[in-house]
């Protein structure tokens, strides 16, 4: 991403009203994208079409209007989707024959943050050439096309139905959820309409929570970042299981019938084992540096190839693509089922897990009996003004890391992650014995603190 002035690896995100997360910048951003798309279309006579989806945070109205005005002024048509999960926008961009898609969301962040991300006509991240052209266009003054070349705006009326049918098509035609009582936590976010409707159409008895957005309650004590809320509701209602999404619907976590949390590592194990038995699994399964060592051991026992990427679903996607794999994810609930969706999709991933359970006649608890997780803990060591990278590379720290890795060899892992944005080193140790894990973590953390002193 070298040379980028405005964009990170996943669009822009931040506090509303500060920096680029402001109405005036987003107005210019819409105009810049419109001009780039008009230029790419050349002289074919058709105005480019851009779809815009958002989550439920109150600032979405402001940014939706700003993007719409900027795009229309540049000569692009706009179709407004309203509240829509991020993966749904990716799917609709790919299948509606439009030129680009935009999501207004800050995912699992609080309501006072927001962000903008883009999809190409293929429903994927913008290519480098388009992104660089967009950056350059932002440095050119706002442009308004001649009146006869201005764009139009409309609402996409059939978007919800299209996406629901896509989700249903990701499971076998005969699959249904009749007789299943489940709790759905929609984080007061983008899935609040679609998810309950879909699961009810499949026959489930749905108990909904986190499905009453008011603009400022997205992710507030609900959703996949507050799984205890879901777990308590499952126990209270004696449900068969619970499903929690995050604010923009690209993450999913679950709770079993006893209210025990089931995270992305657990779900990855369930899917990998089921898909191997079905002959659906191709290539390696991909987790991240933070995937529990118990998952790695379980996959080794099942003779399932397992690779680790850096933390972040985009890195999981990259390693999967390079290795020809179809299944990956991280503990936070970003799951990639690339034979069903091109991006992480919480609803589609949840459906794949439910199909696996139904095919094997198992509950969530039963499906996890072969997975023995090991104690894992991460400590953030703050360094003051010292470079995190330099601290990790210090000889004393490297020696302490080697000692830690030797101490847990064959029983766990020890590793360091310097933050790229703040003076922090993240120290992680896991081992099959909690005392060994804690003692090793204490020694390694102390070495990092001493090196930074």
UniProtKB/Swiss-Prot annotation:
Domain of life: Bacteria
Residues modified as Phosphoserine: 107
Comment on bound cofactor: Binds 1 Mg(2+) ion per subunit.
Cofactor(s) required, per the database record: Mg(2+)
HAMAP family: GlmM_B
NCBIfam families according to UniProt: glmM (TIGR01455), PRK10887.1 (NF008139)
Name used for this protein in its record: Phosphoglucosamine mutase
Organism encoding this protein: Stenotrophomonas maltophilia (strain R551-3)
Lineage start: Bacteria, Pseudomonadati, Pseudomonadota, Gammaproteobacteria, Lysobacterales
């Amino acid at each position: 991403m070298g040379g980028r002035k405005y964009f990170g690896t996943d669009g822009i995100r931040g506090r509303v009203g500060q920096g680029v997360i402001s109405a005036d910048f987003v107005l210019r951003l819409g105009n810049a994208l419109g001009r780039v798309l008009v230029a790419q279309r050349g002289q074919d006579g058709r105005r480019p079409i851009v779809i815009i989806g958002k989550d439920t945070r109150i600032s979405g109205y402001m940014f939706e209007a700003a993007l719409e005005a900027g795009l229309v002024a540049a000569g692009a048509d706009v179709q407004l989707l309203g509240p829509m999960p991020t993966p749904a926008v990716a799917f609709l961009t790919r299948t509606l024959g439009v030129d680009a898609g935009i999501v207004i969301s800050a995912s699992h962040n609080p309501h006072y943050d927001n962000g903008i991300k883009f999809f190409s006509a293929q429903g994927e991240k913008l290519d480098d050439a388009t992104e660089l052209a967009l950056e350059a266009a932002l440095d050119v003054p706002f442009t308004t096309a001649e009146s006869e070349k201005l764009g139009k705006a409309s609402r996409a009326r059939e978007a919800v139905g299209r996406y629901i049918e896509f989700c249903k098509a990701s499971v076998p035609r005969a699959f249904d959820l009749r007789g299943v009582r489940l709790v759905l936590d929609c984080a007061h976010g983008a899935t609040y309409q679609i998810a309950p409707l879909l699961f009810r159409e499949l026959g489930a008895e749905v108990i909904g929570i986190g499905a009453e957005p008011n603009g400022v309650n997205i992710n507030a004590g609900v959703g996949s970042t507050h799984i205890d809320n879901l777990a308590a509701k499952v126990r209270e209602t004696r449900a068969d299981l619970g499903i929690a999404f995050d604010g923009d619907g690209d993450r999913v976590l679950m709770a079993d019938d006893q209210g025990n949390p089931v995270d992305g590592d657990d779900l990855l194990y369930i899917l990998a084992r089921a898909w191997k038995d079905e002959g659906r699994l191709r290539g390696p399964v991909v987790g991240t540096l933070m995937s529990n060592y118990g998952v790695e051991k379980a996959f080794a026992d099942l003779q399932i190839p397992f690779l680790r990427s850096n933390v972040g679903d985009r890195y999981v996607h990259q390693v999967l693509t390079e290795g020809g794999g179809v299944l990956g994810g991280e503990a936070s609930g970003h799951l990639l089922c690339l034979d069903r969706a091109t991006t992480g999709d919480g609803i589609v991933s949840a459906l794949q897990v439910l199909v696996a359970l139904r095919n094997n006649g198992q509950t969530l608890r039963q499906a996890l009996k072969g997975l023995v997780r090991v104690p894992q803990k991460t400590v953030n060591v703050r360094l003051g003004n010292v470079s995190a990278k330099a601290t990790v590379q210090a000889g004393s720290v490297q020696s302490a890391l080697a000692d830690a890795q030797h101490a847990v060899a064959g029983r766990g892992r020890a590793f360091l992650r310097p933050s790229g944005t703040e003076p922090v080193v993240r120290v992680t140790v896991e081992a099959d014995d909690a005392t060994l894990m804690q003692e090793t973590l204490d020694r390694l953390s102390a070495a990092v603190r001493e090196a930074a002193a």
